[in-house]
Amino acid sequence: MAVKLLKGEEIAEKKAEELKERIEKMGVSPRLVLLQVGNYSAATIYARAKIKRGKKIGADVVLEKYEDLTKQELVRRIEELSADKDVNGIMVENPLPKTIDYYDIVKSIPYYKDVDALSPYNQGSIAINREFLVPATAMAVVDILKYYGYEKTTATIINRSPVVGRPLSMMMLNRDYTVSICHSKTPDIRSIAKASKIIVVAVGRPGFLDDTYVTESSVVIDVGINYVQDKVIGDIDFDKVSEKVEAVTPVPGGVGPITATNILSNLVKAAEYQSNTNIGR
């Protein structure tokens, strides 16, 4: 039987339509300010993609690009944007110069404008099952699994970062999955992965996960984005894995489109919250 491809574009489009309706109901375009420090072409590409998607739903997404800023100058700019009642979301683009620690910077963004959802408040809210704004990639994985009907089952996540593995493990626990989380020091990842219905991989290594990690009933979610010979590929050996498993996400076209939309979903939720509570105004 042919492998089932878990595509994300349709999910992203449906979410975008819902966001557009919510913005029309608000009567005001939510505003997201992206802060980029340094000349990183990949960061600029991702920022422009968010601007483009924002326009489609009626959101005002702007990029502030700086050749060089100190940590203190960047924090000062974040404080200015935090105090601006017309700004609903703030996002610092990765990577930053080596002299600036990303997570130190994120702590200075108010939780209700933190559309990347990496602040201690938003991460902690996930841990106690009181989700507010959630990391976009982790939410994209949850969205795909829900859309295709893979819920409340066993899952192995091969990643422990604050962007994917840690929040996703807690978000899946909140939704009654039974979760194992693996990392570079985990012995015998293959056995753990094979014992789970769902396998989520995000290790930043093209072709890392091959057919020795999976069974015929495995559902594989590939979060990896790698550039190899001008092509975008994931963290799995797609040809080998797709020959064996029940279902798999393609790269590109799987998690990616939903991730971009989920940033805007956080923006709209933040704007609604600020309007309803009058916080930050």
From Swiss-Prot:
Keyword entries, A-Z: Amino-acid biosynthesis, Histidine biosynthesis, Hydrolase, Methionine biosynthesis, Multifunctional enzyme, NADP, One-carbon metabolism, Oxidoreductase, Purine biosynthesis
Annotated metabolic or biological route of this protein: One-carbon metabolism; tetrahydrofolate interconversion
InterPro entries: Aminoacid_DH-like_N_sf, FolD_Thplmales, NAD(P)-bd_dom_sf, THF_DH/CycHdrlase, THF_DH/CycHdrlase_cat_dom, THF_DH/CycHdrlase_CS, THF_DH/CycHdrlase_NAD-bd_dom
GO biological process: L-histidine biosynthetic process; methionine biosynthetic process; purine nucleotide biosynthetic process; tetrahydrofolate interconversion
Superkingdom per UniProt: Archaea
Catalytic reactions on record: (6R)-5,10-methylene-5,6,7,8-tetrahydrofolate + NADP(+) = (6R)-5,10-methenyltetrahydrofolate + NADPH; (6R)-5,10-methenyltetrahydrofolate + H2O = (6R)-10-formyltetrahydrofolate + H(+)
GO molecular function terms listed in the Swiss-Prot or TrEMBL record: methenyltetrahydrofolate cyclohydrolase activity; methylenetetrahydrofolate dehydrogenase (NADP+) activity
GO cellular component, as recorded: cytosol
Any Pfam family matching the protein: THF_DHG_CYH
UniProt key word Hydrolase: yes
Family assignment from sequence similarity: Belongs to the tetrahydrofolate dehydrogenase/cyclohydrolase family.
Subunit note: Homodimer.
Primary role: Catalyzes the oxidation of 5,10-methylenetetrahydrofolate to 5,10-methenyltetrahydrofolate and then the hydrolysis of 5,10-methenyltetrahydrofolate to 10-formyltetrahydrofolate.
Full protein name: Bifunctional protein FolD
Source taxonomy: Archaea, Methanobacteriati, Thermoplasmatota, Thermoplasmata, Thermoplasmatales
Encoding gene (name): folD
